[in-house]
């Protein structure tokens, strides 16, 4: 059965009535238990966790109900388990577990939402029967939210259980592909190094033409990025990543990361640029999007990423180590806030480094174990090579590339096809002026 994606709008009055009920549930819990609870378990199950569940339910529905309404199942589980513990009856445990599984199934879009009302009504009736006002108000809040729940009909992908903010879980991957991440949990232990060169006579001619057309700053970097974007349009599995031993796809969001210097000096600070590109982008669109980010980075005295790092470094060492550990745990479960993902150099589709301006050959840059970046592409200075053509010695110019690839996102044959297509685009860059005829989808 096709999964439905449910959502609520904060403009719906029932959403705010639900929030009012949840707030009343918290107040009632605090009033009802005064002087009646003496054990630690009683405090946690009678006050702390039910109040947390009520607040969390309301916050998820109001702040993230448009895309992540399914996460309201988490506070429902917390509330139901606390309710069952306080009751101590086997029949209540069975009823609560059935209710939790049913709610999770429905709110995740696996069943029609019309069944949500009788489930909530059953819980509400049970609460009234046991004369539990805080629990009754919590159940009433769930009932009030029901009329506001709608089904997404735009045909687009919306996250559900197992998905991340920055990626959709690839549930159709082969079994061997899925289990590989458990045997090779780190990127540094699952990377493949690859070096290749491309003859750039046509590419340099193309760059000169683009500059004459008005893209005055068009460079090798823009051409390489445009070719990579077009490659993802044909080979979408290149835009996958591994996180928490699961395979995810970024879909049509190509997050390109690059480090730039504000000035070409050894003492100049580095700034991270992250530009979001689309598989249908042309070379001109890549040029404009990338240059906007470069301009922002160079004009700002201190970027958001710089300020965040400075804040972390102000923390004592042991506390900082704990903060990093906590961040890794959040990343494992896909719970890192979106604003942190946006400024993180460790999260993206690909990391480019152009060392040509430094006059050196491209390096084999390591992958990051933390984060999601599965591909590191470096290119360096142009080089000349003498070759024999038709019995004569001719001089050609080449650009060298190095790739560091996470082998867990796709197999070797797929990677070989990707590299060949990428180099072919750079040999015939004029195709980058027009959008691709078709954009392949990684997940149908």
Model-predicted regions and their roles:
Residues 67-75, 113-118:
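Cytoplasmic-side transmembrane-helix entry/capping segments in multi-pass membrane proteins
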Residues 53-57, 74-83, 97-101, 118-126:
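Hydrophobic, membrane-inserted alpha-helices
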Residues 31-47, 62-69, 81-95, 108-112, ...:
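Membrane-helix interface and helix-disruption motif detector
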Residues 51-67, 100-106:
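Canonical alpha-helical transmembrane segments
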Residues 2-22, 38-49, 232:
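Cytosolic juxtamembrane helix and N-cap/initiation of the first transmembrane helix
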Residues 26, 120-128, 138-150:
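Terminal signal-anchor or tail-anchor transmembrane helices
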Residues 5-6, 31-32, 70, 85, ...:
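C-terminal catalytic/motor cores of large multi-domain enzyme assemblies
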Residues 14-28, 73-79, 120-121:
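Alpha-helical transmembrane segments
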């Amino acid at each position: 059965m096709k999964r439905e994606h449910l959502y609520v709008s904060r403009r719906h009055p029932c959403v705010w009535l639900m929030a009012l009920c949840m707030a009343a549930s918290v107040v009632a819990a605090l009033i009802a238990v005064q002087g009646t609870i003496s054990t630690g378990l009683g405090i946690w199950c009678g006050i702390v966790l039910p109040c947390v569940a009520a607040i969390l339910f309301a916050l998820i529905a109001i702040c993230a109900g448009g895309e992540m309404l399914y996460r309201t199942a988490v506070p429902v589980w917390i509330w139901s388990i606390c309710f069952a513990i306080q009751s101590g009856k086997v029949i209540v445990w069975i009823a609560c577990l059935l209710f939790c599984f049913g709610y999770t199934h429905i709110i995740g879009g696996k069943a029609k939402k019309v069944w949500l009302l009788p489930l909530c009504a059953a819980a509400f009736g049970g609460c009234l029967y046991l004369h539990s006002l805080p629990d009754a108000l919590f159940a009433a809040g769930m009932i009030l939210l029901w009329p506001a729940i709608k089904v997404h009909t735009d045909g687009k992908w919306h996250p559900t259980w197992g998905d991340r903010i920055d990626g959709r879980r690839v549930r159709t991957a082969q079994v061997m592909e899925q289990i590989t991440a458990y045997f090779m949990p780190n990127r540094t232990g699952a990377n493949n190094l690859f070096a290749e060169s491309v003859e750039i006579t046509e590419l340099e001619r193309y760059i000169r033409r683009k500059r004459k057309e008005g893209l005055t700053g068009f460079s090798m970097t823009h051409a390489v990025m445009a070719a990579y974007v077009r490659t993802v349009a044909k080979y979408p599995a290149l835009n996958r990543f591994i996180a928490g031993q699961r395979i995810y796809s970024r879909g049509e969001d190509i997050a390109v990361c690059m480090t730039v210097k504000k000035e070409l000096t050894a003492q100049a600070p580095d700034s991270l640029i992250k530009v979001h590109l689309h598989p249908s982008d042309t070379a001109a669109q890549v040029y404009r999007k990338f240059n906007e980010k470069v301009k922002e980075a160079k004009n700002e005295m201190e970027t958001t990423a710089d300020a965040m790092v400075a804040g972390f470094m102000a923390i004592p060492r042991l506390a900082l180590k704990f903060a990093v550990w906590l961040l890794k745990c959040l990343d494992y479960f896909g719970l890192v806030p979106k604003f942190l993902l946006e400024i993180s150099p460790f999260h993206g589709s690909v990391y480019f480094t152009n060392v040509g301006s430094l006059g050196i050959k491209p390096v084999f840059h390591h992958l990051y174990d933390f984060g999601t970046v599965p591909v590191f592409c470096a290119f360096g200075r142009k080089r000349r090579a003498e070759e024999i053509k038709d019995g004569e010695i001719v001089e050609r110019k080449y650009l060298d590339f190095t790739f560091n690839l996470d082998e867990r996102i796709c197999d070797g044959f797929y990677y070989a096809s990707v590299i060949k297509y990428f180099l072919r685009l750079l040999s015939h860059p004029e195709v980058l002026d027009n959008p691709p005829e078709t954009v392949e989808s990684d997940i149908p």
